[in-house]
Amino acid sequence: MALNLKGKSFLKLLDFSPREIRYLLDLSRDLKRAKYAGNEVQTMQGKNVVLLFQKNSTRTRCAFEVATLDQGAHVTYLGPSGSQFGKKESVADTAKVLGRMYDAIEFRGYEQSVVEDLAKYSGVPVYNGLTNEFHPTQILADFLTVEEYKGNLKGLKFVFAGDTRNNVATSLMVGCAKMGMHFVGAAPKELWPSEDLVNQSKEIAKETNATISFVEDMKQACSDADVIYTDVWVSMGEPAEVWESRINLLKPFQVNMDAIKVAKPDVIFMHCLPSFHDLNTEVGRQIYEKFGIPEMEVTNEVFESKHSVVFE
C-alpha cells in the first residue's frame, strides 16, 4: 500500500507505524546526504512555517530554522515573550489564527494537550519540538545517528540511564518498541515511567520482536549495550529540594567508564544536551557548590571519549 504522510502532524511516536517512522528516517537520511553533496532540492518554496516556543531552546530552534530555510520556506519565530499564546488568547484561537497564515506550526512547550489542540484547531500540520510528555523529533535525530554508526536499528540494545519518566526517555522507549530494539531503562523504581505507557510499549514490542525492561542496577543494564543514553537529572525552575532528592536517587546511575567497560566495545554514548559534565556552566558550578559533585549525569571522561557521539 502506498505511503502518504502529507498533511499529517507529528505529535508523538505512538501515532506512527514502524513503516511510517522508517519512511521519515529514510527521508531524513536522503535530505542530509543531499545537503552535504550540495544538490538538495527545495521542496517548500513559497511555504511559511511558524516556530511557537513556550520554552527557550538552542538546538531545537536552530535545527528547525535551518531545515526550513534549506528547504526554501520562510520561517517566523515566536518565543516565550513574543505572542499572547496561552495568556490573552486561548490555544484554540491562536491555532486558528496561525493556521490561516502559515502552512505548518512547530511547537515547543509544556503540556502535550496544547500541541494536540494546535493540531486539532489549526488545520495545518503541527510538529512537536518538545512537551513535558514527549519529544518525538529528538528521537528521529537520535535514531538516524544510531543508524549511521550501527548500520541498522533492529535488535540493538538501547540503554537509557537516569530519570526514565522524562520526555526523551519515554519517547525513546516507544521508538525502540516501534523499531524492534531492546530498550532497557536504568533507574530507581521511583523514577520509572507510568505503567500505562510501559504496557503500551510492551504491546507494540510484541509485534516487532523488541523488548522493554527496567532495572535498578547500572552494571546489569549496560552489559553488552550497543547504545547508552542519558539526560540531565534536574531542570532549572525545579525547587532545590527536588534537586537534592533527585541527585541522591540518581548518583548510582551516572554514565561513567565503569558503564562503558561492561558494554560492547563499539558502544556509542548519546545525550540530547545540554549536559552537566564539567564545571563550565553556571548550573554545573551551582550543583558543585551545593552538592559537591563536579560531574552529574555523565563524567567528562565519557563525554569526551571516542564512544561519545553527542555532537553528531
Swiss-Prot record:
GO molecular function per UniProt:
amino acid binding; ornithine carbamoyltransferase activity
Where in the cell?
Cytoplasm
Question: Which cysteine pairs make disulfide bonds?
Answer: none
- Keywords of this entry: Arginine metabolism, Cytoplasm, Transferase
Biological process (GO) annotations held by this record are:
arginine biosynthetic process via ornithine; arginine catabolic process to ornithine; citrulline biosynthetic process
Specify the superkingdom: Bacteria
Q: Which residues bind L-ornithine?
A: 167, 231, 235-236
Q: Cytoplasm: is it a keyword of this entry?
A: yes
Q: In which pathway does it act?
A: Amino-acid degradation; L-arginine degradation via ADI pathway; carbamoyl phosphate from L-arginine: step 2/2
Catalytic activity line of the entry: carbamoyl phosphate + L-ornithine = L-citrulline + phosphate + H(+)
Residues the entry annotates as binding carbamoyl phosphate: 57-60, 84, 108, 135-138, 272-273
User: Kind of enzyme, top EC level?
Assistant: transferase
Q: What is its main location?
A: cytoplasm
Which family is it part of?
Answer: Belongs to the aspartate/ornithine carbamoyltransferase superfamily. OTCase family.
Explain the purpose of this protein.
Answer: Reversibly catalyzes the transfer of the carbamoyl group from carbamoyl phosphate (CP) to the N(epsilon) atom of ornithine (ORN) to produce L-citrulline.
HAMAP family the UniProt entry points to:
OTCase (MF_01109)
Task: Please name the PANTHER family in this protein's record.
Answer: ORNITHINE CARBAMOYLTRANSFERASE, ORNITHINE CARBAMOYLTRANSFERASE, MITOCHONDRIAL
What name has this protein been given in UniProt? Answer: Ornithine carbamoyltransferase, catabolic
